[in-house]
């Protein structure tokens, strides 16, 4: 079985002769995996894929096998919800609420798309001014700078992300904090061990 360990982005594949190249149709979940065995379209064989982790293949990208063979990636049709709105503001508001729920979201000029979810459809219906339609379509969400949507504990980079978050937290805790009270006065202290100082300070003021 041939192995593809790299790929060419669709924007850079324009000069390639792909007229005889086999294709492989993949869902979004499959396009986000870095290592897997693929069945080529039209029964044209198998391909092992072992590309760099954290990559998401897009419709029109070209996998390159070790022997130079090209395989064209085709995005499968998926069950999605397409959101339209009466105004750009209402569409942006829908995107905001979906983003708060860590939804993988495809953002186009006049619509949004996400994997169909009846609960999210009900949530959008309560916003007003937006329409969500269920359909089969190619789904290519904006995966952002980190290559994915909501990250969980089993994600490959979770350890690094958690360490960074912990470092930021401890740096914040070590910095003096200013507290302001309703009486218009303020004071600075380090950490959160207040002891009896607040009561004495307030009594004097």
Swiss-Prot record:
Molecular-function GO term, any one: nickel cation binding
List, in alphabetical order, the GO biological process terms annotated in this UniProt record. protein folding; protein-containing complex assembly; urea metabolic process
The reply on keyword Membrane is no
Say yes or no: keyword Cytoplasm present: yes
> InterPro entries, per this entry?
UreE, UreE_C_dom, UreE_N, UreE_N_sf
GO cellular component term, pick one: cytoplasm
UniProt biased composition (Basic residues): 178-196
List localization entries: Cytoplasm
**Major site of localization recorded for this protein:** cytoplasm
**Annotated region (Disordered), positions in chain:** 178-205
Could you tell me which CDD domains the record lists for this protein?
UreE
**Record keywords, A-Z:** Chaperone, Cytoplasm, Nickel, Nickel insertion
Q: Per the similarity annotation, which family is this?
A: Belongs to the UreE family.
Q: What does this protein do?
A: Involved in urease metallocenter assembly. Binds nickel. Probably functions as a nickel donor during metallocenter assembly.
From the Swiss-Prot or TrEMBL record, give the protein name.
Urease accessory protein UreE
Gene that this polypeptide is encoded by: ureE
